[in-house]
Amino acid sequence: PPPGQTERLTTRPGVSVPIYAVWRSDARATLVLFSGGAGGYGQIGSDSWPAGGNFLIRTGKRWAHHPFNVIMVGRPTDGIDLSLGRNRIDTTHLEDNRALLHAVRERSPAPIWLIGTSMGTISATASALADREALVAGLVLTSSIVAFKVDGAVPKQDISALRIPTLLVHHAKDACWGCRPHEVRALARHLQQTKPHRLLFIEGGGTPQGD
């Protein structure tokens, strides 16, 4: 697919959040991707696509092959450390994400789905729960942070209050201490009030790597 473009969105006074955006006139949905680790999408490579190694970023071209707007969320310019879970549930981060959602909605009427992986699942969940304007149509969490020792871990948030379609995707042999598969099953049980919801375990693949 043709590459997207980098944009800067003003989210707070004196602060902006860069995004890498692929816009399509035939988009059926807008996918807002929250990467793991400290967030962001890395540098732009020679092919004009983000070169970050995170799962959601390195698969960006695959998303763009389908009729979706694809938004990869960068790091705010004031240097908030998004490797810390507490910063991903803080009002400042949520304010940034709310401004981002408004900017996306102004650009396209397509339903907005938030997708997070690893630490990005904290951001995606918190932003969905903070949405009081029905901007978010659905939520996808991959390799969810479920360890209670992590501030903002998904099961520590009020996920039973979610009222949007929610999909949990997890590798059956995820070896990360923060993403243990058996704890994801417990997480899914807290989504009983969320209609529809689904837990999908996958197996196989290449050599494991951290995201």
Whereabouts are the PLM-identified features?
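Catalytic histidine-centered segment of alpha/beta-hydrolase-like enzymes
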Residues: G205-D211
